[in-house]
Amino acid sequence: MAKEPRSLQGKVVAITGGARGIGKATAKALAREGAVIAIGDLDAELARATASELGEGSVGLELDVTRRDSFENFLDQVSERLGPLDVIINNAGIMPIGPFAEEDDATAKRMIDINLHGVITGTKLAIPPMVQRRTGHIVNIASQAGKAGVPGGATYCATKHAVVGLSEAVRAELRGTGVEVSVVMPAVVNTELGSGLPDTPGVKKLEPEDVANEIVNALKFPKFDVWVPRSSAAISTVMQLLPRRGREAIGRLLNVDKVLAEPDKGARAAYEERAARSEPGLEPGEGESGSGKKRTKSAAPR
């Protein structure tokens, strides 16, 4: 007998980095299901504009996922304006790429602060009220790079491996509480973050809506591992049965080793510049970081 899908009508959903890309597509998909959406983004103006596209009731709010006080304020506003939080989607992330030995420390810190610490903070803050109500769903956006190491994206892969491990551990801790956890692992997506990345033979770039639809499905039919496309799960299982040399040889045959290592730099230039302005670690009112970069209102994009 087929399982009945859970209704998302009236559910309060908070999406970090939700003003663009996967976050925006997911917000639209959930709004069509009747959910009420809070868009959190460092670009507050764009967050409000995105929320206005979703219809009455949804809100756009400023959020810097690298600051706990900003995250607390965001979730407090969500509860005050929309009601108790039912779902949090930790989506904010950046992906500057290049040879690991040439990566400066500020870039590495930025990725870790946004991609990992942002997920940790969002998950920690969401758990207590969800456990108290014995209901809720935490969705952490990782990547298929969280299951492998890809040249050109060493630190990015490290953050996504961490998100997968974090999600597995938290899921085990929350067993029996009524709170669900999902980790989403997309292949390359046709967003600004994926701009300039080469195609691999037989693998088509995903659209943000493809990922959004799988997130909606994971909320309606709760599951932990959310592979996008779904066929990736079987491919990953088969690959893990092969010895390392075999896996690496197949990866080279499919040009997987070139996806992040050999991008079209001209096509990625605008994204890389904007990602570099997603400056974490500044105290409120502070205009300069230790690297001398000025803080600007730039979302953590996907």
List each language-model region with its residue ranges.
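Canonical Rossmann dinucleotide-binding motif of NAD(H)/NADP(H)-dependent dehydrogenases/reductases
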Residues: 5-36
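The beta1-alpha1 cofactor-binding region of Rossmann-like NAD(H)/NADP(H)-dependent oxidoreductases
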Residues: 44-45, 63-73, 105
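A glycine-rich helix->loop->beta "capping" turn
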Residues: 56, 77-88, 96
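Substrate-binding pocket helix/loop in short-chain dehydrogenase/reductase
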Residues: 99-100, 104-112
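Active-site helix of classical SDR
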Residues: 123, 159
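Residue(s) in the substrate-gating loop at a strand-loop-helix junction
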Residues: 143
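C-terminal helical subdomain
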Residues: 183, 199-236
